[in-house]
Amino acid sequence: MHGNSSCRLESLETVQYLLPQNISLFCFDFAGCGNSGGEYISLGWWERDDVALIVEHLREQRRVSTIALWGRSMGAVTALLHADRDPSIAALVLDSPFSNLSKLVNELAYQYTKLPSLLVSPVLQLVSNTIKNKVHFDIYKLSPIDHVKNSFIPALFATATGDDFIKPHHSQDLHDAYQGDKNFIKFEGDHNSARPTFFYDSASIFLFTTLQCGQLLTESTKFTAEQMKVRRKEIRDKKKAE
């Protein structure tokens, strides 16, 4: 699931890592993004309802066995907001979510203006009232950290050490408060930089285990998966050569 000001194309990088594990992907545009209709986004608040509908659709189609959610930034927040109300989700990959929206806004305001939170609060309240009228949700209630205490789904948290937009402590705080089985990966880069290979490899192994893909693979699909691994290496070598 993609971040703010993005679309489903953000998911393309994961294809070469997940398909060899016999893991299919459902990539989509949130409302108000990409080719989807809608005027506003809500940074996870209403997007979780998009996810609920998609999960319901996939289960009704009976073409998948288990379902995991992989999200970055807004997409990771959406996954956390959905997870505590749907414990049947098998796994979560959470790349750079914020822990609390009002906290994030105060941090960004101070970072770019050096204004103390005492001065930011009245402006934030004005913005909150406008959002309530137009988008119909309260930004003060957009707090993923309030949801993780009720989440028990295996989760892989990840953050870039140089992220100056959603700082690494947000992922750390969420990880520390999370109640389910959890892992945490840190890598070099910033909020929107390309993720390193070891992150994708770690996430692939994590999903292969939690989705129990090994129990579903037949000899024919194992052969196909091996071919895909070879092809993935060829793609990497080509990128390095370029």
Pin down the residues of each PLM region.
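Hydrolase active-site cap/lid region
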Residues: 81-140, 146, 186
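Conserved alpha/beta-hydrolase
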Residues: 15-37
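Short beta-strand/loop motif that positions the catalytic acidic residue
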Residues: 150-152, 157-159, 163
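Alpha/beta-hydrolase active-site loop
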Residues: 10, 41-62
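Catalytic active-site module of serine/aspartate enzymes centered on a nucleophile-bearing elbow/loop
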Residues: 197-242
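The serine-hydrolase catalytic nucleophile loop
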Residues: 4-17, 30, 169
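Short alpha-helix in the alpha/beta-hydrolase fold that links the catalytic acid
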Residues: 14, 144, 153, 167-176
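Catalytic histidine neighborhood in serine/cysteine hydrolases
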Residues: 175-194
